[in-house]
Regions:
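Conserved non-catalytic scaffold segment of RNase H-like nuclease domains
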Residues: 1-116, 126-130, 138-152
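Acidic, Mg2+-coordinating catalytic module of metal-dependent nucleases/exonucleases
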Residues: 88-91, 95, 100, 104-105, ...
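Acidic, Ser/Thr-rich low-complexity intrinsically disordered segments
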Residues: 187-234
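A ubiquitous structural signal for well-ordered alpha-helices
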Residues: 76-79, 165, 218
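Short, well-ordered coil↔helix boundary/capping segments
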Residues: 130, 153-156, 205-209
Length: 234
């Protein structure tokens, strides 16, 4: 099965080259485009102020991050790298997320994530919907993906939304449904094998000798040739 990681980040501002930092990162694991239920999510203290414009977007305050670890903590940087492994990384406007993540990895003296690993859903959307607005919100509305659970932008909820959008961009729910049906058919085959296989011990008769004799008398004496199964030579 093809494993991919959908991810999103929140930051203190727009550009790591001017000193801005990561404050949240979230990932969801996909197998053949469908979420497996495995995820990674961390908040990080940035050691700097958060720009007011950025805070209005994601709602994360420095006070909230006061007790959160730095990115270079093993439970953040190393755990993140272990989770993503060598799988392709899916992001919306990937250069933004890649720039911040690689900036943090380099600060932690860890190898950056190569550009070739990244799948950017923004150009995919622009190719499918040329000349249209292709933000994550716009794509969710276009594909009728509910935004009801999201009050502000956040890495975890945005990653879940992006996973649904990515499925649509790669062929839609029909493809996901086909995969689900295949899995269901496989399960049904196992159930059928169990249901119709030979019993290790035959069931004991559930009718008495007297009941079986009365049934035979009814069939032979009352129904005779009127029994419906006689029409089929049974």
């Amino acid at each position: 099965m093809a494993r991919e990681i959908v991810l999103d980040t929140e930051t203190t501002g727009l550009d790591p080259r001017t000193g801005h930092r990561l404050i949240e990162i979230a990932c969801i694991e996909l197998e053949d485009l469908l979420p497996t239920g495995r995820s990674f999510h961390r908040y990080m203290h940035p050691d700097r102020e958060i720009d007011p414009d950025a805070q209005r977007v994601h709602g994360i305050s420095l006070a909230f991050l006061a007790d959160k670890p730095r990115f270079n903590h093993p439970d953040v940087a190393e755990a993140f790298l272990e989770f993503v492994g060598d799988s392709p990384l899916v992001a919306h406007n990937a250069p933004f997320d890649r720039g911040f993540i690689n900036h943090e990895l380099e600060r932690a003296k860890l190898a950056p994530l190569h550009e070739a690993r990244w799948i950017d859903t923004l150009p995919l959307a622009q190719k499918r919907f040329p000349g249209m607005h292709n933000s994550l919100d716009a794509l969710c509305k276009r594909y009728k993906i509910s935004l009801a659970d999201r009050e502000k932008h956040g890495a975890l909820i945005d990653t879940r939304l992006l996973a649904a959008v990515y499925l649509e961009l790669r062929g839609g729910r029909e493809r996901g449904l086909d995969l689900t049906v295949k899995a269901q058919r496989g399960t049904e085959a196992v159930i059928a094998a169990v249901a119709y296989g030979p019993r290790p011990r035959p069931l004991a008769p559930r009718s008495t000798d007297a009941e079986r004799a009365a049934h035979a008398e009814f069939i032979g004496g009352v129904l005779k040739d009127k029994a419906i199964w006689r029409r089929f030579g049974v």
